[in-house]
Amino acid sequence: MNDRPRRPRRVQLSTPGSSEKMMQKASESKADHVFLDLEDAVAPSQKRDARKKIIEGLKTLNWGKKTRCVRINDLTTEYAFEDIIEVVEGAGEHLDTIMMTKVMTPADVLFADKLLHQLEKKLQLKRRIGLEALIEEVEGMQNVDAIAKSTPRLECLVFGMGDFSASMGVTNKNVGSSDGYPGDVWHYARFRLVMACRAAGIDPVDGPFADFRNPDAYREECNRSMILGCVGKWAIHPSQIDVALEAYSPKPEDIARARKLEKAYAEAEAKGLGAINVDGVMVDVASIRILRNTVLNKADLYGM
């Protein structure tokens, strides 16, 4: 139970749990990962009804190989514990992960971890339900290293720059953009989250970009976070899916080159050589490690 499953997270598609129509469309999309939302996308008066719709959607829709996730309300609300209990009791066998919101400390994650442990025993579930945590408050970012290492159940951290803007007092008219800042206003926060995730062996994921009518700006944000080490990004609209899939997938020519270099190095290593020249490029153990972590492992995970 300590082994974390490897899941594609190039695109995490946000889907309101109150809409059967949108859940149907999400199940038919090309997204790697769909999270059915019980938090911001659902009005307080509709949250209990949305749980029922989510349970039905998880059980009846064909999700293919997608990661099926439910985003719950934060632990300061009266909804969070019932979100977990009702969804897991109703559709635990059809659920891969639960996304926690406004995570501040490791104790927040451990609360959900213990509750899920009890539910899994009660329901005799055959596999563990994973956790994903949104880091979207200053306190959460200050504690991000400890949060990332809080439990083996935790699979990824997501940078939620919308609420983080409010927490920091950052002027951000368009969530996910830099709004005139001379550079990337999110560079430090993203970099810090990625480092915490890599040290803990979990996935770093970038959050939303609100202006879904601007695919070029969305692509730029995807590329920025990908270069920093993020494995994927939220899509708040289906039109963003293809952009993110392309941005976070290794290019076919890069895969071919990486496999060529890996093969050449393996052959050289068998002959006792430590570094070789391939097409004018020095290849050694360090460069092979980079290729595996940035190209080859991703290609294997995505079936490329």
Per-segment meaning from a language model:
Residues 1-304:
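Expand to "…catalyze enediolate/carbanion chemistry for C-C bond making/breaking, isomerization
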